[in-house]
Swiss-Prot record:
<comment type="function">
    <text>Bifunctional enzyme which can phosphorylate or dephosphorylate isocitrate dehydrogenase (IDH) on a specific serine residue. This is a regulatory mechanism which enables bacteria to bypass the Krebs cycle via the glyoxylate shunt in response to the source of carbon. When bacteria are grown on glucose, IDH is fully active and unphosphorylated, but when grown on acetate or ethanol, the activity of IDH declines drastically concomitant with its phosphorylation.</text>
</comment>
<dbReference type="GO" id="GO:0005524">
    <property type="term" value="F:ATP binding"/>
</dbReference>
<dbReference type="Pfam" id="PF20423">
    <property type="entry name" value="AceK_regulatory"/>
</dbReference>
<keyword id="KW-0723">Serine/threonine-protein kinase</keyword>
<dbReference type="GO" id="GO:0006097">
    <property type="term" value="P:glyoxylate cycle"/>
</dbReference>
<dbReference type="GO" id="GO:0016208">
    <property type="term" value="F:AMP binding"/>
</dbReference>
<keyword id="KW-0808">Transferase</keyword>
<dbReference type="GO" id="GO:0005737">
    <property type="term" value="C:cytoplasm"/>
</dbReference>
<dbReference type="GO" id="GO:0008772">
    <property type="term" value="F:[isocitrate dehydrogenase (NADP+)] kinase activity"/>
</dbReference>
<dbReference type="InterPro" id="IPR046854">
    <property type="entry name" value="AceK_regulatory"/>
</dbReference>
<keyword id="KW-0418">Kinase</keyword>
<keyword id="KW-0816">Tricarboxylic acid cycle</keyword>
<protein>
    <recommendedName>
        <fullName>Isocitrate dehydrogenase kinase/phosphatase</fullName>
        <ecNumber>2.7.11.5</ecNumber>
        <ecNumber>3.1.3.-</ecNumber>
    </recommendedName>
</protein>
<dbReference type="GO" id="GO:0004674">
    <property type="term" value="F:protein serine/threonine kinase activity"/>
</dbReference>
<keyword id="KW-0329">Glyoxylate bypass</keyword>
<keyword id="KW-0963">Cytoplasm</keyword>
<dbReference type="GO" id="GO:0004721">
    <property type="term" value="F:phosphoprotein phosphatase activity"/>
</dbReference>
């Protein structure tokens, strides 16, 4: 730090630091309260209530940042505080975090408040946390030894596993009764034995489970790991309400790929109570070492921390790469200017200044659609986005064609400035960042017959799961869907999405005369929010291979009755079950006696468990 203050002499500096930390502590207290509510609502089967607190929680962070900023402006005239005092504020804040259990989150909160108060030209290393100041290693929950980050169990042998897993379940103290816990524990032990086969039990054989349940959609997940010798295996046990209304263990997941799907960027955030979030992230990284810490924080509902870490990783990549940002390959969009850095697996999307026909939208409406997706259950079929404002890029790293695209289609979204090193920078005023995927239209055009079959099956499943979750994609062209690196189809173009319950599902009227029948134009009245599933054939079935696969697997896609049935169930208050694993993994399907005991209610199938978004 330049001009490091030799003496922390300002009482105002300490008071401001204390006020900012109080704001964060209030935020995290409310954040944890949602997790407590999630347990109660899960036990009661209050699915609409769970959805509501999930939506509400997303707004908590910005509300507390605004609240803290107002207090600092009103009580300390924060915008006019001298630079020397800001340096002292940061140092006092570091001191206050010495024994804090969420220091990394509190540092990010400090940055958010600072950047709200100060102009971006003041965002320098002296005022904000560009790197962590407080270590998060080995933070222990000493205040509550009965709630460690994780619990360790020692089965002793294969024969002791049943008692071990029974203790695991009981320690979560769920108030709702289980339908038949002994039966389900038997299935868990059976599945574990089948998975490990003749694996020799080592002296250190043990099971670790995180102390809090992970709530999402209509499931609660036990997350843990199995240690044997020098090997570590992931463990996840979803708990659901069975057809009887009582709790059941739905399956056990023991593969890294299955955990990666569970924590995918295409799913909504978990609700989980964490006293020490960094310890949870460390545990999860142990069973998913390929998963970036930024994505793990985000999946835990700490999306601002994920966003902060992502940006640090991005700056690090820029520092150690030399390729240029280019216009993203593929069909140009009417609403978004999309660019990418070939060496980095993400795309950057900027809303254009104007939209040619037939698009009828506005910048604010597009932003509202992206916010809708952020707050909705993405059911593994919509990519999460990171939203940033005033991002400065080195101009020398922008391809000339990309600069021309900006100046032609989004001139209001950029400005030029000199960086601290004297180099020219291009500042993008607002940008969404998403994981880069292969556009489905390219995948279907260039793929083998087997890949086309797979892509069509996935596309149909994706749309059906979205409408079951009350999302109508709007523009369903293949170019608006992507294929992840492991073959899962995901929707990523949100400017035309609507709630299915707001749409009118209609049959195409019968032509009244020969002129209407032969007309190449739409001759019937189309109102806003009207959907005509029969017309989807026109733009989905043009390719011979695609058509054959589509009609084999998703012929009902063009039947208005299929769409209307989903809408009717949604209007009746039904909340669908969505599973982040293949239905064949569920005990009711895996073991015949489970199926006969519990029934086999039809649920949307997310596809083969090997696929990782």
């Amino acid at each position: 730090m330049s001009h490091f203050p030799k003496l922390l002499s300002s009482q105002i500096a300490f008071d401001v630091a204390r006020t900012m930390l109080d704001g964060f502590d209030k935020h995290y207290r409310l954040f944890r309260e949602v997790s407590h509510q999630a347990k109660l609502k899960f036990e009661a089967g209050d699915w609409h209530g769970l959805q509501q607190i999930q939506r509400d929680r997303i707004a908590f962070y910005n509300e507390r940042v605004r609240e803290s900023s107002v207090i600092l402006e009103d009580e300390y005239d924060a915008e006019n505080i001298e630079d020397e005092i800001w340096q002292q504020i940061k140092l006092h804040y570091i001191g206050l975090l010495t024994n804090h259990h969420q220091p990394e989150l509190a540092e990010t909160f400090f940055n958010s408040v600072c950047t709200r108060i100060l102009h971006r030209s003041y965002f320098n290393n002296d005022f904000i946390f560009v790197r962590p100041a407080i270590s998060t290693e080995y933070i222990e929950n000493e205040e509550s030894p009965t709630r460690p980050t994780f619990r360790a169990y020692y089965p002793g042998s294969r024969e002791g596993m049943a008692a071990c897993f029974e203790r695991v379940v009981h320690n979560f103290q769920l108030e709702s009764p289980f339908e038949d816990l002994q039966r389900d524990i038997g299935y868990v032990v059976r599945a574990v034995s089948e998975h490990f086969g003749d694996l020799r039990i080592a002296p250190n054989f043990q099971v670790h489970t995180l102390s809090s349940l992970f709530f999402r959609n209509k499931s609660a997940f036990i997350i843990g790991r199995i240690l044997n010798g020098d090997r570590t295996f992931p463990l996840a046990i979803p708990i659901v309400h069975g057809p009887s209304g009582k709790l059941t263990l739905d399956t056990v997941l023991l593969k890294k790929e299955q955990l990666l799907i569970l924590f995918s960027f295409t799913h909504s955030y978990f609700m989980v109570d964490m006293e020490i979030p960094s310890a949870y992230v460390t545990f999860l990284r142990d069973i998913m070492p390929r998963k970036p810490r930024a994505e793990i924080y985000t999946s835990l509902g700490l999306q601002k921390q994920g966003k902060n870490l992502f940006y640090r990783d991005f700056l690090h990549h820029l520092q150690h790469s030399s390729d240029k940002f280019i216009v993203a390959p593929g069909i140009r969009g009417l609403v978004m200017l999309v660019f990418t850095l070939p060496s980095y697996p993400y795309v950057f999307k900027v809303i254009k200044d104007f939209f040619p026909a037939p698009k009828e939208t506005t910048r604010e409406l597009v932003k509202s659609k992206y916010q809708l997706v952020k707050q909705h259950d993405r059911v593994g079929r919509m990519a999460d986005t990171l939203e940033y404002s005033d991002v400065a890029f080195p101009l020398s790293r922008f391809d000339e064609a990309l600069v021309r695209e900006f100046e032609q289609h989004a001139p209001s979204m950029i400005e030029y400035q000199r960086g601290k090193d004297g180099g020219e920078e291009i500042v993008v005023r607002h940008v969404y960042i998403e994981r880069r995927m292969t556009p489905l239209n390219i995948y279907l055009t260039e793929g083998t017959d087997e890949q086309v079959e797979h892509g069509v099956i996935e596309y149909g499943n994706a749309v059906k799961e979205l409408i079951a979750a009350n999302i109508f994609p709007g523009d369903m062209l293949y170019k608006n869907f992507g294929v992840t690196r492991h073959g899962r189809v995901v929707f990523y173009d949100y400017d035309e999405i609507e709630y299915l319950t707001d749409c009118n599902i209609r049959d195409v009227p019968q032509p009244r005369n020969e002129e209407e029948e032969m007309s190449g134009e739409v001759w019937y009245t189309v109102r806003p929010h009207d959907i005509f599933p029969e017309t989807f054939r026109t733009f989905l079935l043009g390719d011979t291979r695609v058509r054959a696969a589509f009609l084999r697997h998703h012929a009902d896609f063009f039947d208005p009755a299929m769409w209307q049935s989903h809408k009717d169930r949604l209007l009746a208050g039904h909340v669908h079950d969505f599973f982040a694993y293949h239905s064949s993994e569920r005990f009711i399907h895996r073991y015949s006696e489970a199926g006969s005991a519990q029934g086999t209610a039809a649920v949307p199938d997310p596809g083969p468990a090997r696929r990782v978004a």
